[in-house]
């Protein structure tokens, strides 16, 4: 097995069964690098990245669109300090911009230049949902991945995902993927691909990288209600380390991506990963996380279990569970993150809440008894500015 940047204190896992590489169980998510005056603070960002690499991290995740390209440029700058051949770089293709075959080439070559690399180690189709998956197929992204792998400019091919489990299965089965990237955390382990997707992909030999381990920062502590923060303190449980350990306690993920923006966050996470292993989560930690998880479930605006029973009855194809997940997350983090609105905008017109014709056919299929048409009006108002 190949291993880069080995350090005894870091823990490593194989990326699936196809790659033959060992990846640090903690990876750097380069979407939330240190900022100053609305732009990435390059000096602090490079120092942060080098602190992680010095601790044995060998996986950095970025994307074409992060910080309007500045994230990739800063990662390239950090790697120029002697790290280029010691670290795996993952970046992503903006699939939503792919209108026809060949559209992949310009952004890909821009990424090579930004990252100062001749080959991308881990390359992903970015944010696949139903709409973006269709664009990927129509623009022949899979064939393009094959060609670039043959040329040696992409080593491993994967995708990141934001939709439901059934589509996730379809995508996993459609291509010989080396790895994938999913949202996964203790607060909502069933959302999107979820635990089922984690096990499904892993069972196929596909490596699974985990993003959003802290639910967009919500699980880090400050955004939790006071009683939850007090509970963590009284039980001697760290909200961040326990959330990470919850994921590392499971054998399937090969890396957990943390969007660290401060050096102390990096140092804390490096300390936590030293003891990461399957089954490492203590019963004390588990009991606290279960209570916090219960609170989140009870206080999300829409008590949707994402069972999907409503979907077949919809005459226009509104993606009800996906919409409710986006709405819940957006409000739980008090509208502080741009990802839910961006994902909403990327959906097909007939999938959006505004496509609902208010026929009510879905209501009789909902085990939770939700007023689905009423909630869809609220989702429309939230993401499209139309009155409910």
Residue ranges and their predicted role:
Residues 59-66, 155-159, 181-182, 255-257:
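Short catalytic-loop micro-motif centered on adjacent basic/acidic residues
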């Amino acid at each position: 097995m190949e291993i880069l940047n080995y350090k005894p204190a870091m823990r490593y896992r194989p990326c699936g069964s196809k790659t033959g590489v060992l990846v640090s169980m903690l990876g750097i998510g380069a979407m939330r690098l240190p900022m100053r005056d609305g732009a990435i603070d390059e000096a602090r960002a490079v120092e942060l990245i080098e602190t992680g690499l010095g601790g044995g991290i060998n996986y950095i995740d970025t994307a074409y669109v992060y910080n309007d390209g500045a994230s990739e440029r800063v990662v390239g700058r950090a790697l120029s300090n002697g790290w280029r051949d010691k670290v795996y770089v993952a970046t992503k293709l903006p699939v939503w911009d792919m209108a026809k075959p060949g559209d992949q080439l310009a952004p890909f070559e821009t990424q090579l230049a930004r990252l100062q690399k001749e080959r991308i180690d881990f390359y992903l189709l970015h944010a696949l949902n139903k709409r973006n998956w269709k664009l990927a197929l129509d623009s022949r992204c899979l064939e393009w991945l094959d060609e670039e792998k043959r040329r040696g400019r992409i080593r491993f091919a994967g995708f990141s995902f934001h939709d439901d489990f059934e589509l996730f299965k379809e995508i996993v089965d459609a291509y010989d993927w080396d790895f994938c990237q999913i949202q996964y955390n203790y607060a909502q382990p069933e959302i999107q691909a979820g635990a089922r997707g984690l096990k499904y992909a892993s069972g196929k030999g596909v490596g699974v990288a985990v993003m959003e381990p802290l639910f967009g920062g919500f699980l880090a502590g400050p955004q939790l209600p006071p009683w939850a923060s007090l509970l963590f303190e009284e039980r001697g449980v760290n909200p961040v380390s326990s959330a990470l350990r919850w994921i590392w306690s499971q054998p399937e993920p090969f890396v957990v991506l943390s969007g660290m923006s401060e050096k102390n966050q990096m140092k804390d996470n490096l300390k936590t990963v030293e003891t990461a292993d399957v089954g490492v989560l203590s019963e004390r930690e588990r009991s606290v996380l279960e209570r916090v998880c219960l609170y989140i479930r009870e206080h999300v605006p829409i008590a949707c279990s994402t069972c999907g029973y409503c979907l077949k009855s919809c005459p226009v194809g509104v993606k009800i569970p996906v919409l409710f997940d986006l709405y819940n997350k957006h409000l739980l983090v008090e509208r502080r993150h741009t990802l839910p609105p961006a994902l909403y905008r990327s959906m097909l017109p007939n999938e959006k809440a505004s496509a609902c014709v208010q026929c009510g056919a879905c209501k009789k299929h909902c085990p939770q008894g939700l007023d689905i048409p009423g909630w869809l009006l609220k989702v429309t108002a939230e993401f499209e500015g139309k009155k409910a």
